[in-house]
């Protein structure tokens, strides 16, 4: 049966159901036997295309932002389906941008706190290396084997030393000088102690400068590996008219 009859300027066009289309194709095939081969082929191809298009359109499910896999071409989407695909692609693009931003933030934090030569972790590692290389510290902590000197952060319930946080603060004074202060613990077969560091960085400079770097071992005198205040006092006492303190030359 015919579904719908519409009038056009060129004539009358019938919109047929799939059953009618198949019946029409059968009739057309029978009629085409009386036609020349070329004309019959054209009629058969046209009928099959019309049937395939009608069948495919009736079977295709509606495209939404949740089930769109990009298989249906853009030109075959309805206005609502195009809007849904645009929403899906905008959401996916936003996720990509968010991932890039988060990755960049994590990379920046890793560089500034771990991999940078001026990071807290870098100064912690260099301080431990200097303690292991100092004969005074080795004699009090691990005589004869400096490699057995271990360092860790604040005491916690976690028995894994690497998981203990290092106490460190960074602040600027009213002159714009950055102060990095850090302290951690060292242990050896013979004894244990506390390490303190104070470094400064002048405005416009990239490197920190040691102000104090000491090791306190219980029952022993403090060991200074760096003591800028003592150097300044010695310079004043020796009559040196020019000395350096906090990265600035003083007269």
Curated annotation (Swiss-Prot):
Transit peptide (residue range): 1-51
One Pfam family this sequence matches: TIM21
Keywords for the protein's UniProt record, in alphabetical order: Membrane, Mitochondrion, Mitochondrion inner membrane, Protein transport, Transit peptide, Translocation, Transmembrane, Transmembrane helix, Transport
Residue intervals on the Mitochondrial matrix side: 52-90
Coiled coil: none
Membrane topology: Single-pass membrane protein
Protein name: Mitochondrial import inner membrane translocase subunit tim21
């Amino acid at each position: 049966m015919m579904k719908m009859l519409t009038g056009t300027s060129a004539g009358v066009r019938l919109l047929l159901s799939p059953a009618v289309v198949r019946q029409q194709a059968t009739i057309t095939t029978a009629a085409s036997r009386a036609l020349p081969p070329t004309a019959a082929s054209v009629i058969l191809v046209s009928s099959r295309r019309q049937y395939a298009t009608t069948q495919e359109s009736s079977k295709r499910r509606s495209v939404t932002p949740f089930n769109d896999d990009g298989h249906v071409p853009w030109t075959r989407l309805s206005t609502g389906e195009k809007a849904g695909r645009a929403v899906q692609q905008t959401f996916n693009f936003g996720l990509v941008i968010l991932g890039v931003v988060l990755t960049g933030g994590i990379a920046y934090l890793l560089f500034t706190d771990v991999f940078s030569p001026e990071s807290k972790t870098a100064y912690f590692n260099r301080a431990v290396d200097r303690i292991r290389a100092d004969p005074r510290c080795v004699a009090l902590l691990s005589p004869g084997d400096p490699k057995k000197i271990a360092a860790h952060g604040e005491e916690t319930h976690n028995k894994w030393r690497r998981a203990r946080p290092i106490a460190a603060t960074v602040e600027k004074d009213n002159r714009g000088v950055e102060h990095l202060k850090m302290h951690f613990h060292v242990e050896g077969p013979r004894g244990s102690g506390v390490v303190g560091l104070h470094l400064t960085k002048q405005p416009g400079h990239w490197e920190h400068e040691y102000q104090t770097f000491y090791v306190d071992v219980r029952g022993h005198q403090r060991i200074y590996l760096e003591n800028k205040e003592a150097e300044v006092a010695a310079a004043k006492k020796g009559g040196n008219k020019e000395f350096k303190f906090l990265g600035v030359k003083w007269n």
